[in-house]
């Protein structure tokens, strides 16, 4: 068995069965089951769901949506990602799987907006997300860093 990796989840009945394992683990606000059922198309690879399989079973998941700021009162301008419903099964928590999912999203090099759920503020702080407060509620934002050490045409490597 190789090292687990983040992959886009297919929208199909197998994924639906895997999502049922998460139903009792978290709060209702983390449930993706109804969202998946509403969008089920056999083997649709354009799903917003991403996860990590370990030993053939889904152990961690999140949903990731591409958005564009249309004047909302927060510090992201242009295209960004909304990361929702990050959840790791209890037996696999505190082993880096949640961080793997977030790092996958960071690797897309867009700003990320998320809402800290269920006492997870420390997790987002550890991953360099910044808290933002607006009249509609609080959330966390991460911005990709610009590489200040990039070699230009005029410099030598």
Swiss-Prot record:
* Enzyme Commission numbers on file: 2.3.1.-
InterPro entries in the record: Acyl_CoA_acyltransferase (IPR016181), GNAT_dom (IPR000182), YlbP (IPR017274)
Enzyme class, top EC level, equals transferase
Keywords (A to Z) from UniProt: Acyltransferase, Transferase
Q: GO molecular function terms here?
A: acyltransferase activity, transferring groups other than amino-acyl groups
Task: Look up the domain of life of the source.
Answer: Bacteria
The residues covered by the N-acetyltransferase domain are 9-146
Protein name as annotated: Uncharacterized N-acetyltransferase BCE33L3680
**Originating organism:** Bacillus cereus (strain ZK / E33L)
């Amino acid at each position: 068995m190789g090292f687990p990796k983040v992959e886009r989840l297919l929208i199909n009945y197998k994924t639906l069965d895997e999502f049922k394992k998460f139903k009792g683990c978290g709060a209702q606000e983390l449930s993706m089951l109804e969202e998946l059922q509403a969008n089920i198309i056999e083997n649709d690879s354009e799903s917003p769901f991403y996860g990590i399989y370990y030993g053939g079973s889904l152990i961690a998941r999140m949903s990731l949506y591409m958005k564009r700021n249309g004047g909302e009162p927060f510090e992201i301008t242009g295209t960004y990602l909304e990361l929702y419903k990050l959840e790791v099964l209890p037996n696999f928590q505190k082993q880096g799987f949640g961080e793997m999912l977030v790092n996958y999203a960071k690797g897309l090099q867009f700003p990320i907006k998320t809402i800290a759920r269920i006492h997870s503020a420390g997790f987002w702080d550890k991953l360099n997300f910044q808290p933002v407060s607006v009249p509609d509620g609080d959330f966390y934002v991460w911005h990709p860093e610009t590489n200040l050490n990039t070699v230009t045409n005029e410099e030598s490597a």
